[in-house]
Amino acid sequence: MSLTASAASAALTLLADGPDDGSKRPWRPNDPVKEQRDLYTQFVISTALGLSAFLAFCILRPKWTELYAARRRQRNAASRLPELPDTLFGWIPVLHQITEEEVLQSAGLDAYVFLSFFKFAIRFLLAVFIFAVAIILPMHYKYTGQYGVPGWDNPPGNKTTSPIDGSEKEKPVTDPAYLWIYVLFAYVFSGLAIYMLLDETKVIIRTRQTYLGNQTSTTDRTIRLSGIPHDLGTEDKIKEFVEGLRVGKVESITVCRKWRELDELIDERMKVIRELERAWTKHIGYKRPKNDGNALPLTEQQPRDADDERSGLLSGHDNEHVSGYSNERPKVRIWYGLFKLRFRMIDAIDYYEEKLRKIDEYIQNAREKEYRTTEIAFVTMESIAASQMLVQAILDPHPMQMFARLAPAPADVIWKNTYLSRTRRMVQSWSITFVIGFLTVFWSVLLVPIASLLELKTLETIVPRLAEFLQEHPIIKSLVQTGLPTLAFSLLTVAVPYLYEWLSNNQGMVSRGDVELSVISKNFFFSFFNLFLLFTVFGTASGFYGFWESLRDAFKDSTTIALALANSLEGLAPFYINLLILQGLGLFPFRLLEFGSVALYPFQFLSARTPREYAELSTPPKFSYGFSIPQTILILVICVVYSVFPSSWLICLFGLIYFTVGKFIYKYQLLYAMDHQQHSTGRAWPMICNRVFVGLLVHQLAMIGVLALRRAITRSLLLVPLLGFTVWFSYWFGRTYEPLMKFIALKSINRDQPGGGDISPSPSSTLSPPSGLDRDSLPIRIGGQDLELRLKKYVNPSLIVPLHAAWLPGRNPARGNGNGASAFEVHQTQNV
């Protein structure tokens, strides 16, 4: 279960466990025995789950290298990494010793930045944990008698009971002077977070500038021009305009055109060729070759037989029927007539071969057509310095014209969006942004009423026998009230990030890297607003109407948020402790097993029929920063918000475990197991920093609310300048540091190498085999198939992709009809 699902389920359980007396009083946990039992149960179960998953991975890793070492087997850049031993635990120190430089060279800047965030979080939480244990915990215990451990802290009364020896003692009298720790450590932790964040940012900027300044790829020398007026809509006029700025020479220009017809033909061809391959395979049969045990058990098949004979029989290009096979030639149903009400059965192989031949003719004719130009062009300069000067300058005195941006990698371009008009892209973008905002803000409106059905009082009305049984068995009651929300809402909350990803893909963005950054932003907003802020600020509402009243009051008066935060956070501490234990100890190790890929593999294997479909089974699982980064930021925000509360030491301890385990697991996945095709050159770091600033603001608001509730008005007002400083600093950070995370400084460019300064790199072909990791090495993806080649120039793949023949047993798909097949080699997974 993801963080989204587990957090939503647990939060709904908290709402369901609210007061049953119908009052609107705030809910407070008042059963120390239950809380202590839940904490121990959560810890034991999570530890058992995590250790089981980790041991299972250690056993299966050397056996299922096709899954757990998929990236290293198929990526040249990953092949430079050290070979991991096949022993049970021997791979752990080898992985730990891989340096940040090796991570950068193998997985790129995105992986380097992502793991740097874990390093920052570990450093920060370690410092907070030391302060919490050495100062904050003793202060809280001395003046309030609170340990910060669920079940140990006592309810209000004249005496307290020691959880260690059971002895009774007088309850400490609260001294208002101790409230200064909320003021002091709000400043200390905010300053510490900003200092460490700036320190890590400087390291990332220095690494990024050095790394990109020494690149000579086509991507680094290319800009994307948008808003091109009609009178400058040709290559020659654009070249004249750019070179007239006297910043450098133009190497090549690609003006985007309205290629919709051609793109649709290529997509249709891929569908037809797959149907043809299935028809042939159904007729002649195919079994995947047996491997040496490095794949999942379901891939253990008997070797093919008589492939050489079949290859000879299939080498002809006529439509003569091939006989001698046990299976009959398949048939396909063709509908015709008025309203397509009549049909007839015809030979499927003949039908799809004829359809493929006609589509190939249409494609050849479409490639020779002249298409209308759009307002977008990719301009490749002869030097990186020239391209950087263009993107960092205003090129035209007219607004919204000749606007230069950094270009994505050639294979990262979403070509179908390049021929959308600017108005169409803006309408799509703002419409989907409005839809996502509406869904995110009002998502909890759908969850809170359903949660009320899980209250014991409601169950007594609907299912009285079940309510009586649960009342008699508190452990089963706890499991049921936790499991039912999980069952009801986990699928819904897991589906939300995928819904946002689909919506982001329809916003009209030109590159997949921009889409992923958009997914990061949207998913964090959903997680932060719905699973933290709403359930914390309005978590005291009892029922649906109470929730609506709290929401209405918050919009009327902003101080309600600070007071509600302070009023709810301390009571929700057991929930967040359990959440951190579950995520860090229980669920994180399951990421190593790639349980989703393993669970889906049998269905994918059973549905595979053709050589192409079997080869696609071995492609590495895709890693998405859009799903991973928002969850980790939210965990850090929770730890920051609770950094001064009595339970700060416990929350920071399990947060520290979460980030330590997470860094290790993500390091393995990014380097060895999973593939990430979009490369945004580390541009996610400013987004991470801005969301950390949001966490600091929430922390400061909570401290203001805590002091205000304790009538320490003067001390709460002393935190207002810190609040203003954080807002100002986030603005200053964006103006000062973010440009260095987006552009390459001219001083950082290595002008002694080809393509760096005024020296033009040697001309290269349009396509060449990949060598190492750079932004030109992203594989071209046509019809869901990765091709083992890279584009060296900006050109729509539909214009140049070879029209291969069907990929049949015993015949290389590249030996097709000769339409440029020699320039390509289809990537086929090798079973080493």
UniProtKB/Swiss-Prot annotation:
Q: Disulfide bond as a keyword?
A: no
Name one molecular function that GO assigns to this entry.
calcium-activated cation channel activity
> Which residues are reported to be glycosylated?
N158, N214
Per the UniProt record, one Pfam family is: RSN1_7TM
How does the entry describe its membrane topology?
Answer: Multi-pass membrane protein
Give start-end of the signal peptide: none
Protein name according to UniProt: Vacuolar transmembrane transporter penV
What is the species listed in this Swiss-Prot or TrEMBL entry? Penicillium rubens (strain ATCC 28089 / DSM 1075 / NRRL 1951 / Wisconsin 54-1255)
Recite the lineage of the species: Eukaryota, Fungi, Dikarya, Ascomycota, Pezizomycotina
